């Protein structure tokens, strides 16, 4: 009889344990093609390895949110951490600065990662 109570209790405790685990996202900002001023390209922000799944991602141009942004569906890895890809079309030039800003429960303030055109 005790076995019938203990097993469901252990299952419930393990599920609650999954919610308690928090992993900060890894943020990678890159362009689809090598940067070439004046030529259309895609700006990508790949956010991976995070848990829980609640996350806010913004692509920025000169510190301002880019409105026309698309993203992949939220997916998870074998370790149950999540990943997403945010992307938008853009045309790089010498004066504009691009970045990805991420808000997640593991960050006390949003984290911003700049696009390095030489990567």
UniProtKB/Swiss-Prot annotation:
Give each disulfide bond as a residue pair: 45-100
Per UniProt, residues of the Ig-like C1-type domain are: 25-114
Q: Where in the cell is it found?
A: Secreted
What SUPFAM superfamilies does the record tag this protein with? Immunoglobulin (SSF48726)
Alphabetical GO biological process terms: antigen processing and presentation of peptide antigen via MHC class I; immune response
The record's Gene3D superfamilies line, in alphabetical order, gives: Immunoglobulins
What stretch or stretches form a coiled coil here?
A: none
- Check the UniProt entry and state the signal peptide residues, or none: 1-20
Could you list this entry's UniProt keywords, alphabetically sorted. Disulfide bond, Immunity, Immunoglobulin domain, MHC I, Secreted, Signal
The superkingdom listed in its UniProt entry is Eukaryota
Query: Is Nuclease found in the keyword set?
Result: no
Q: Does the keyword Secreted apply?
A: yes
Q: Which GO terms describe its cellular component?
A: extracellular region; MHC class I protein complex
Question: Which coarse location class describes where this protein primarily resides?
Answer: secreted
Entry similarity comment = Belongs to the beta-2-microglobulin family.
Summary of the function given for this chain in its UniProt record: Component of the class I major histocompatibility complex (MHC). Involved in the presentation of peptide antigens to the immune system.
Q: How does it assemble?
A: Heterodimer of an alpha chain and a beta chain. Beta-2-microglobulin is the beta-chain of major histocompatibility complex class I molecules.
Q: Which protein is depicted?
A: Beta-2-microglobulin
Phylogenetic placement of the source organism:
Eukaryota, Metazoa, Chordata, Craniata, Vertebrata
């Amino acid at each position: 009889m005790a076995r019938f109570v203990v097993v469901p209790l252990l299952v419930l405790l393990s599920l609650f344990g999954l919610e308690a685990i928090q992993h900060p996202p890894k943020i990678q900002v890159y362009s689809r093609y090598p940067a070439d001023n004046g030529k259309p390209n895609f700006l990508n922000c790949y956010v991976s390895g995070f848990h829980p799944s609640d996350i806010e991602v913004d692509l920025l141009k000169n510190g301002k949110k880019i409105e026309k942004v698309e993203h992949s569906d939220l997916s998870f890895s074998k370790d149950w951490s999540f990943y997403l890809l945010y992307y938008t079309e853009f045309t790089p030039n010498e004066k504009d600065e691009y970045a990805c800003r991420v808000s997640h429960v593991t960050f006390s303030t949003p984290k911003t990662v700049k696009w390095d055109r030489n990567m």
